Structure formats: C-alpha cells, structure tokens
Amino acid sequence: QGHPLYDKIVIYFVESLYFLEQYQTVVEIINQIKDENIEHATRMALLPIQDMAKEKLNQRQLKASEVLRAFQETQFEEQINLLIDLIDHHLGIFNLTLAQIIENEVLHPNVQSLILEYLRLSEWSAEVKFNKIDENITVIPTELPGIERTNFTQNIIPKVIDQLEIDSPSSIELAKSLLNQHAIIMYPITLNDINDDVLVACYLKLLSERFNIDANYESVTQQDWDMFIEVIQKLQ
C-alpha cells in the first residue's frame, strides 16, 4: 500500500490468482484487502471476483461430496486425485466422512495414507482405527508426523541414497522411486523389529539382487532378511 498503482496491481494480482484457480487464496486476500483504505472502485472490482471464487469453491465442495458418497466404487486414481484436491482446497470440511471411510472401507494403502494426511493437516484429534497391510492400527492424526517427517523418510532413505551416490549414481532415481513408494504405503507403520542400519543394508541388498544395482552393504542375517522380505511382500 502507498504505491500510486497499488489498486491496479491488487486487481491484477487477484485476477491472476483467480485464473490460476487459487480460489481459496482469492477469498482470503480480498477479505484482508477489504479492511484496507482502498478506492471504492477497487473494492467494487474485487467483490465480484470474490463472489466468483466462492462459487467455484462451492462447486468443488459439492463435487467432492458427491464422489465421497460413492468413494468405495470410485477408481483408485480418482480416489487419489480427489484426496489431493481435498488436501489442497478443503481441509477440515470432510473430517468425519473420511474418518468413517478409512475405518469401514477396504482401501488401497496409498489412499489410507492420504486420508491420514488430510486428517492430520485438518487437526483431527479423535482416534482412528483401521487395518493396513495386515496390521491393526490405532492413531490420533494430530499426533502423527507428516509422511515427509517419518523415520523412514528422514533417516532410511537418505542413508540408502548416500551409499548409492558412491556405488551407483545412475540408479538413484530408481531407488528413490521405490523407497518413496514404500514410505507412502507404510505410513504410519514403523518397522520397529528391524533396526535402522539393518534396514538400510536390507534395502541395498534388495536393490543389488533384484535390480542388478551395484551397492555395497553390511552383511545381513538370514533372520533379518526373512523378516524384511516378509514386510516387502506386503508392500507390492
């Protein structure tokens, strides 16, 4: 504020956000600007944009509601896309619905992970109980770390990648893809029965044997390897 072209810049900025489909941001920014000392003409230019943005948000919410009502019959890809959209645009609106879905429906592990992420970001503090890859889980979403902050993501993946940077740099993207996929599928399960160093060695052994990737790793006992493979088979 104070710039001679402030009002024109504001209108241009808000219009740009609208055409980029950032409807929630448009609504929030105009709410802030309305309290400022701006020209009446600027205010009258912004209010219709806010109304249109609210209408777009309502349309999105209605569409999301319709899909959620038949969530179990929806294809996997559409479930994923819907949950990503809900995380981006509708936090807090469908908490109870999604909590009921994860507790009562048979879902792909990736879908379960995204529902948990939605509930965590929406600060859902009630217990959620569900079964994931043959394990009964009870969590309170607000107490969960995000997928990007689990021990697997912050410690296991970097150690595997660090070793591959030495032994086989060309295989890093393949390894990252596999490891990130496993991180999402397992969330929020922690592999407490296998310590971190053994888990890193097991992943390097897996990459070496199944994908012909050159990787040096510490020796792994047959018991640890069998336990690791049992987990991996559930993730496929």
Where does each model-flagged region fall?
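Charged, low-complexity intrinsically disordered regulatory/assembly segments
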Residues: 133-236
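Amphipathic alpha-helical scaffolding segments comprising HEAT/armadillo-like alpha-solenoid repeats
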Residues: 27, 61-69, 91-103, 125-131
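Inward-facing hydrophobic residues that define packing positions of alpha-helical scaffold repeats
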Residues: 1, 29-31, 86, 98-99
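Structural signature of alpha-solenoid helical repeat junctions
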Residues: 4-5, 78, 111
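Residue-level signature for tetratricopeptide repeat
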Residues: 16, 53, 84-85
